[in-house]
Amino acid sequence: MFYLMVLLLVACAPQQATQQEAQAATISKMRFHCDSDTTVINQLLAKGLESGLTDANALVEFYARQLLGTPYVAHTLEGDEELLTINIHELDCLTFIETLYALTRATMAHRNSWRDFAANIENIRYRGGEMGDYSSRLHYISEWIIDNHLRGNLVEVTPDLPHVDYMVKNIDYMTHHTDSYRQLKNDTAMVEKIRRYELRNHRFPYLKRSWLNDKEVKAALRSGDFITLVTKIEGLDVSHNGIIIVDDKGDPYLLDASMSGGKVMLESKPLFKFLERSKTNIGVRVFRIMP
C-alpha cells in the first residue's frame, strides 16, 4: 500500500537556501512505496559520502552495486493521480537509472537527505524539472535526454563514439497504443497532450550493436555510463536502460533492472553477446551525468 505525504517545505526553507534546498522546497506531493523508503535512501547517501568518491561515473557504479538484488517491478509510477513516486524497494529499467542519477547528484553536492534525492528525481523525471500532470513526465528517452541535457543534468556521448550512425524516426508509440496506458485509455484530452510532445522525423545518434566488440568503441566506454538499447519497434526509440560495467579485460557488461532476471543484476555475458540474442534491439545510446 502506498503512503501519501504532502510536504509543506517552502515556509521552512532558510533565507539563504542552497539550490538543492530550494529544489526540495518545491516538492508538493509524493507517494512512497513504504515507510522505510526515506530511511533506506538516507542510509545509501551516507554510504556514498563515506566512500569518498567524487567522480560521477564512479558514484553511479557504486550505487548500482548497492542496489544489486532489488526486485524488478514494472508500472510503479502509475496511479490515479500524478504524484512524485519514490520507491527504492522496487525498480524497473528507467526508475533504476533515475535512482542512480538522484543518489549520485545528491552525493556530488554533499547532500545526505532523502529530500535532496526526491528533488533530483523530480528534476530528471519531468519536463523542465517540474512535476505537473501525467503529460509532464518525460515518457520517451529521446526527449528525456534532450530535456536533461539542456538543463545541465546529462550529456550524450554517443556522437563522440567511433563508428556512430544516425537514425530518423517518429517517436509516437504512446498515442498509437493508448490501450496500453492506463492514463490514456479513456482520456482523449490527455492523449492530445502527449501527442504534442511526441517527436516527428526525429534524428538521433546510435551505435550499431555490431560495433560493440570493437576495440576503439570499448576503449571509449566507461563503467558508470548510462546506456539505452535502441529498438526497431515502430514508434519507439529505445526499449531498455541500464549502466555499463567494464571488466578487467576491457569488455563492457550491462548492469540493469532486468525483467527476465526479476531483479537488479549484472548480466553474465559481455554487452555485444547480450544483444546478439535480441530480435528488436539494434544498437545503443550512451550518456553520462554532467560534472
Give the location of each predicted region:
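Bacterial signal peptide processing site
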Residues: A13-Q15
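Cationic-aromatic interfacial patches
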Residues: Q19-E98
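C-terminal motif of bacterial Sec signal peptides marking the signal peptidase cleavage site
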Residues: L9-A11
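Short, surface-exposed secondary-structure edge patches
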Residues: E216-A220, L236
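C-terminal soluble interaction/assembly domains
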Residues: D225-P291
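Short alpha-helix capping/helix-loop boundary micro-motifs
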Residues: P205-V217, T231
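Acidic/His-rich structured neighborhood in mature extracellular/periplasmic domains
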Residues: L67-F204, R222, V246, G250, ...
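Sec-dependent signal peptide recognition
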Residues: M1-V6
